[in-house]
């Protein structure tokens, strides 16, 4: 079951499992813009934190927030921080979390959702309808690329 969770719950998972070696601070929002650049105005939008629960145990997370319009994409929503605990992978929970994040974005009026996934999780994003929008390149947290999907 997917439900909204608190910042503290998702931050714990991100800091301890998804990005344990990250040197920059982990915050509720990302200033990243689609296909490059940063804009602090992204932090003016509402962030939503989602958790996937099995038998009342939190086994996966994802978040999303609106981003400033760019010439590349217009009104857009960032999916960020997808993580499913190792023993629960391969069951479709990551895809369900991405789809639930897309539903939140659509309900808020967004038509495009984008992310910056690690190459190790690309298959999950592809199953959820994302297409690659850039080449893969090293980042602070792994090898990543920009990807997007239309919310219809």
What function would you assign to each model-found segment?
Residues 1-13:
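A short beta-loop-alpha structural element at the N-terminal edge
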Residues 14, 125-126, 130:
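Conserved active-site tyrosine of GNAT-family acetyltransferases
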Residues 14-54:
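Active-site rim helix/loop that mediates acceptor-substrate recognition in acyltransferases
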Residues 51, 57-70, 76-78, 83:
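Conserved beta-strand in the GNAT
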Residues 88, 92-100:
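Conserved acetyl-CoA pyrophosphate-binding loop and the N-cap/start of the following alpha-helix
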Residues 97, 121-124:
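Conserved short alpha-helix immediately C-terminal to the canonical SAM/SAH-binding motif I
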Residues 105-118:
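Conserved GNAT acetyl-CoA-binding A-motif
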């Amino acid at each position: 079951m997917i439900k909204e969770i608190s910042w503290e719950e998702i931050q714990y998972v991100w800091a301890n499992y998804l990005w344990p070696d990250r040197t920059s601070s982990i915050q509720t929002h990302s200033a990243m813009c689609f296909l490059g650049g940063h804009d602090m105005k992204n932090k003016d939008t509402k962030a939503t934190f989602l958790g996937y629960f099995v038998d009342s145990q939190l086994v996966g997370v994802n978040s999303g927030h609106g981003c400033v319009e760019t010439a590349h994409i217009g009104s857009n929503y960032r999916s960020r921080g997808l993580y499913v605990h190792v023993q629960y992978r391969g069951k479709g929970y990551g895809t369900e979390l991405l789809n639930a994040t897309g539903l939140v974005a659509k309900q808020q009026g967004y038509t495009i959702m984008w992310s910056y996934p690690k190459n190790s999780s690309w298959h999950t994003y592809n199953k959820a309808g994302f297409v690659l929008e850039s080449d893969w390149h090293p980042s602070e947290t792994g090898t990543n690329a920009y990807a997007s999907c239309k919310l219809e």
